[in-house]
């Protein structure tokens, strides 16, 4: 098996950079325009999850009736599901499928005798991970890689006027150093690699002479805008023409540029001689007068580039036609992105291709819908993470003027341990192969701005065990990165190379252990999660300044930032307690907070050439148990099923678009814990007015980052109607948004505060809110984080049936300020005595009067953690209860506060 891997990779790599002769990893689909015959092989297929090929599977009479009937695109996986019951979900615990192994596909198609004399190609847009293909029992070849298109020459295997039996063996086994998929990237990554024939399959028939079908899935035609302005443009067109004719022949290769109306704008032609089994390569130049440039979202004008092969008598032998935008692109540290010489700041999102119910087997309409969601938010760029995406997203981006970051699946790990050097070399070759395929298949798309060669491989270097190296060793990805960067320049000198790193100058990692990847490629991206995995959200700006100071001549972007958010989890104060970056406590409001703070830092740093949010949509990954989901990364601005746009989505829509919009945040937090709330509204309107229960509570204008806040708004008992109205400068209504919040009687003129908690515990008797209304102190928990995919380690707290309520606490020097009606109140203080640590003694002062003394000091307790409650009566005279905790010995610690009138 290892020899086959090595041979296959060698064939592909060396064909381009100097390795060998024949290559079966071939071309991409193009428009046929009545010259090529193209048949979609979408259904019916039969599928069985099995590693064994039945001996008679190639026979027309083989009985596959017990196999699953499927249509292609297809994936056998269903991964990730939500735990809430607020809405119906396609995925449930009962119907998911995370199997990684081998599946067999079988179908039949027919060709009539009129197709004899043609050459026939089976084109697969993507099969994950390793595909082996047989037609009528004849082995056609294999492809190693989950994402790029490949073609196999089926000419000698087809039959006419009889069924053609097509069998595909798909190996999606999890890569290990010993597996059949060992060399096939990705070998790591925080996303699930779905198995199957998950993009379309078709049969293409050509004449003897045709544009090259064996060029790594590319179109065989590669056009580059050499220069362009509004007066003139020059386009270099490289075409590859293949002949299977038994004799030499002269053909004319004509290149045409058609405008959007189909009118000829520029043309050139050349006569060449082609011979049997030879591929001729020629370069031609188109000069275009008064071109209409492809100017991003401002004017995404598309021509059509057409290459026609003709016989001397004018008979058309082959024709390909693709959308083409005339544009140049450059990226510098001084000016950022220059599109046709004009500065363009890129702001957008990263995008994984899966969605609930389909996995990776999405339709073109699914992709169209996804891109529409991103574009409506105001994104002008998409990072296609962490692998090559299909043609639909590229075509849509061309039409809409979106700029794309394309990248290969070299993610986190690039090798196994030192004892596996043979397969490690094969992995490097597979990286080169997937890079060649990606560049050639997407070369003509004006939307593609950069070619990405890696994502966070510096992580594998700072954590050697991640790449199976011994602790203390220093595995180095830099040689491979330099190789790939140089290959990009050979493949396409018109676009910059790029990569995304994770760890440079992040305090979590010792700088000496982090490989310097920042200046290997022509541009660089930083994946940074301040306020989530490390540090505070406000740390991002100074960190970026540090990078810019260290690499002043390197164009730097932010390629990932953000936080997880569960739309069914809510907090009253994002700073009320610690967030669980790898666990369940991920309130929607904290996610929004991180985006607000991070975007403020990014938008104030013009030296950044681009930024991409992580991520547009929640996506599947079996490494996570977080938020309100299982096996889902919750950082998406939109849920996995596309049903909910989280609040952070509307923050960007307010800041990135001018089409009038208004959005009230925390709308899904309907049953309110507190009678007093800050109401936050995102809007791009000049004026925003807030109404509560039909009465105006004021207008806001020129809100910072288009975020308007009305502080300390008191809700009425029962139903509360909240409406935000966006107004023009003359006070005329442009747009409005309304929600309903509920304040139950038990919460009216009362407080139940779960101190130290960002998400309140569910208790036996009362409805507690998360920690809020505090001044000072520090949030803490007696529970310990469980880490990636593991539940927290719960502390054993004696003396209570509400363990979760006592598990979190606020400690140090702190107090609470609580608006209340005048009157008498019962105040209950919940706290824990830890007899295994130094004693703690503190007093409780309310409105400057001592109401409880010596909490902790007089409490008899068992060993370990013991729950206690002390009560006092407090009279409110001026509409406010001020509670302070005064240390006598050690630090005060309070787990909860309950305040009720009597």
Model-found features: residue ranges?
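Compositionally biased, intrinsically disordered or flexible polar/acidic segments
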Residues: 742-902
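Extended acidic/polar, glycine-enriched regions
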Residues: 159-163, 238-332, 710, 716-718, ...
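Accessory beta-strand-rich segments of carbohydrate-active enzymes
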Residues: 49-50, 83, 95, 100-214, ...
